[in-house]
A protein has these predicted regions:
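Conserved small/polar residues in nucleotide/adenosyl-binding loops
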Residues: 175-183
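N-terminal, positively charged, Ser/Thr/Ala/Gly-biased leader segments
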Residues: 22, 37-96
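An N-terminal boundary/leader segment
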Residues: 1-56
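Proline-centered helix-kink/hinge sites
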Residues: 25, 41, 78, 147, ...
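Hydrophobic face of alpha-helices
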Residues: 26-30, 55-58, 78, 111, ...
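Short glycine/serine-rich loop/turn segments
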Residues: 74-174
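Short alpha-helical functional segments enriched in proximate histidine and acidic residues
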Residues: 35, 39, 57, 61, ...
Length: 183
């Protein structure tokens, strides 16, 4: 299987292949990171990629498989987190110059759960400032582009995440949706 085919496989198919030892977390992560380094400059999906962290986690995940340890549901599966979510030790800008250099000490509980399930953290995806726009064009990182037509937007506020998954830059991205409620 070539790297492009690998990058467009679903998380559930990848998880099955990892458990069956047909493919390793390192192979998957290397393929995805290679694609990120090639396409992210054009698409601007990731505002803060974490390739070193991802490779460290992938090597650890692979060793756990070799050691016969119990595997989490996302063991070896690459994922990203929308930049509105706090991630301990990783810059969280919220798409705003106000927080351009913010590195939180706390993190969103789902980030902890994804890591505990064995996921491989690829980095933070772009979002418009504070997520309040239907186009992902952060004043810090610029415009995120649709991978199928660079003249179009992937939307917002999860434009980075949607472009990431559509372009095969990782099968999973944690975003969020805030809906207005009646008072």
């Amino acid at each position: 299987m070539n790297n492009e085919d690998l990058c467009f496989r679903s998380a559930s198919d990848l998880a099955s292949d990892i458990r069956a030892r047909r493919i390793s977390p390192v192979e998957i992560t290397e393929a995805v990171l290679d694609r990120i380094s090639t396409l992210n400059p054009k698409l601007n999906c990731f505002c803060t990629p974490t390739p070193d962290t991802a490779m460290d986690q992938a090597r650890r995940a692979e060793q756990e498989i070799m050691d016969g340890r119990p595997l989490g549901l996302l063991h070896g599966i690459p994922y990203s987190i929308k930049d509105l979510q706090m991630t301990r030790g990783v810059r969280t800008m919220r798409g705003s110059k106000i927080f351009e250099h913010s590195v939180p000490e706390d993190e969103n509980p789902l980030q902890t759960r994804l890591a505990n399930a064995g996921g491989i953290f690829l980095g933070k995806t772009t979002t418009p400032e504070f997520g309040w726009k239907g186009v992902t064009d952060s004043p810090v990182t610029g415009l995120t582009r649709n991978p199928w037509n660079l003249d179009c937007t992937p939307g917002g506020s999860s434009g980075g995440a949607s472009a990431q998954v559509a372009a095969g830059l990782g099968p999973v991205s944690y975003t969020h949706l805030t809906l207005p409620t009646k008072a």
